[in-house]
């Protein structure tokens, strides 16, 4: 499981680097879509099946349409790729190298704690004698309607504002 999450985190950061170093709008959208899908797989890997599915459906349902529309408006006959400009490609390779260096430095201390599981008492569905059973699907529904309500409102508002920002940028 650790190797699975490590590979997913490297792919997630690679997608984020691809987004940050976009030579053409098509590849920026591709990097964002890859990062979003792999982020949802990371949520699934930590046991959040409902939350991972909801984020995946909302993300692909909403933002994929926006990126498809904007890349259709900003198409070029010969788009520049990541490998066509050595300056951009060198930053991409440098970013990947820095990811590996940071991971190596964190693994030297053996004190890497990705997720803090100390305050899970609120999320237990059924508890007998200090043993709690956690249902993943129900936890996702509870998280959306309890503590993540404002986060969902902010995410929806960000998507709504992002549509207008992208349309204004690509408008003639």
Swiss-Prot record:
The chain crosses the membrane at residues 1-21, 26-48, 52-74, 86-106, 147-167. GO terms for molecular function: NADH dehydrogenase (ubiquinone) activity. Pfam families: Oxidored_q3. Keywords: Electron transport, Membrane, Mitochondrion, Mitochondrion inner membrane, NAD, Respiratory chain, Translocase, Transmembrane, Transmembrane helix, Transport, Ubiquinone. It catalyses: a ubiquinone + NADH + 5 H(+)(in) = a ubiquinol + NAD(+) + 4 H(+)(out). GO terms for biological process: mitochondrial electron transport, NADH to ubiquinone; mitochondrial respiratory chain complex I assembly; response to cocaine; response to hydrogen peroxide; response to nicotine. Its EC number is 7.1.1.2. It is an enzyme of class 7 (translocase). It is a multi-pass membrane protein. It is found in: Mitochondrion inner membrane. The keyword Chloroplast does not apply. GO terms for cellular component: mitochondrial inner membrane; mitochondrion; respiratory chain complex I. Core subunit of respiratory chain NADH dehydrogenase (Complex I) which is composed of 45 different subunits. Belongs to the complex I subunit 6 family. Core subunit of the mitochondrial membrane respiratory chain NADH dehydrogenase (Complex I) which catalyzes electron transfer from NADH through the respiratory chain, using ubiquinone as an electron acceptor. Essential for the catalytic activity and assembly of complex I. This is NADH-ubiquinone oxidoreductase chain 6.
């Amino acid at each position: 499981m650790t190797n699975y999450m490590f590979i997913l985190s490297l792919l997630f950061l690679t997608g984020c680097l691809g987004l940050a170093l976009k030579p053409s709008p098509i590849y920026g959208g591709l990097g964002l879509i890859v990062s979003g899908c792999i982020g949802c797989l990371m949520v699934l890997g930590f046991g959040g099946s409902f939350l991972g599915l909801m984020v995946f459906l909302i993300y692909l349902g909403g933002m994929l349409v926006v990126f498809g529309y904007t890349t259709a408006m900003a198409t070029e006959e010969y788009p520049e790729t990541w490998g066509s400009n050595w300056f951009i490609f060198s930053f991409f390779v440098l970013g990947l190298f820095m990811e590996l260096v940071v991971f190596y430095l964190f693994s030297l201390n053996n004190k890497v704690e990705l997720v803090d599981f100390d305050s899970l008492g609120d999320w237990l569905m059924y508890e007998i004698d200090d043993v709690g059973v956690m249902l993943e699907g129900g936890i996702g529904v509870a998280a959306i309607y309890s503590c993540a309500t404002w986060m969902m409102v902010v995410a929806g508002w960000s998507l709504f504002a992002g549509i207008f920002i992208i349309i204004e940028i690509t408008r003639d």
